[in-house]
Amino acid sequence: MVRSVWKGPFVEGSLLKKADVARSSGRHDVIKIWSRRSTILPQFVGLVFGVYNGQKHVPVSVNEEMVGHKFGEFSPTRTFHGHSGDKKAKKA
């Protein structure tokens, strides 16, 4: 279900503060965040965020195509090792 337009996008307050500090200082360090549910805003374009996936912070550099999506979409939490193959097909 899509979020109501009148509510606006959800962004963690601390995330906005961290992004403003990074923009004003001009430093291009990775901004560590734990808020995977926050929406990517246009003012985040060009910044690099370290999005926590449960084990480590995955670096995500934000571009214009990511605006409107959530940070969690770009930091997978599960590793897929593939389905087990058919052993009969491998031998033949």
From Swiss-Prot:
Pfam families: Ribosomal_S19. InterPro entries: Ribosomal_uS19, Ribosomal_uS19_bac-type, Ribosomal_uS19_CS, Ribosomal_uS19_SF. Keywords: Ribonucleoprotein, Ribosomal protein, RNA-binding, rRNA-binding. GO terms for biological process: ribosomal small subunit assembly; translation. Coiled coil: none annotated. GO terms for molecular function: rRNA binding; structural constituent of ribosome. GO terms for cellular component: cytoplasm; small ribosomal subunit. Protein S19 forms a complex with S13 that binds strongly to the 16S ribosomal RNA. Belongs to the universal ribosomal protein uS19 family. This is Small ribosomal subunit protein uS19. The gene is rpsS.
